[in-house]
Amino acid sequence: MTVPKKALSVRAPWWWLILHGGKDIENRDWPTNYRGSVLIHASKWWGTTEVLLTMQEFGPLAERGGAPRVTMEQVRPYGGCIVGMVDIVGCVSASDSPWFFGDYGFQLANPVAFREPVPCKGALGFFTVSPDVMERVRAQVGGNRP
């Protein structure tokens, strides 16, 4: 299996909803032509009120899709880590997905949550992870994804 070299930093709890809650759109104010797998980096940014309100609003949607209930205390420690990977299969400016709002939506498929988070400095937009981070990601991805 090929592990992507590119990563995308996503704020809490959105990254958790992508990997566990059925979130099939990542909203951005810029479009992308990129298609393929990308590592998901959990941003260190933390706005308690925003995270809480997001979890209250979108948590039930994720739970209807079979995701377990999650708390802020469970999500917060993962900030500053690569936590999984997902495929970007399209970019749209309109969608019927309940997860879509904003200017552009990266259409997502095949999320994989990693067993152990891998510490990594994030960046804006797509960014390339360092060789040592890639090595740690490869070491645990083995059986997670065909």
Model segments located where?
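Structured alpha/beta reader/binder surfaces that contact nucleic acids or chromatin modification marks
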Residues: 1-146
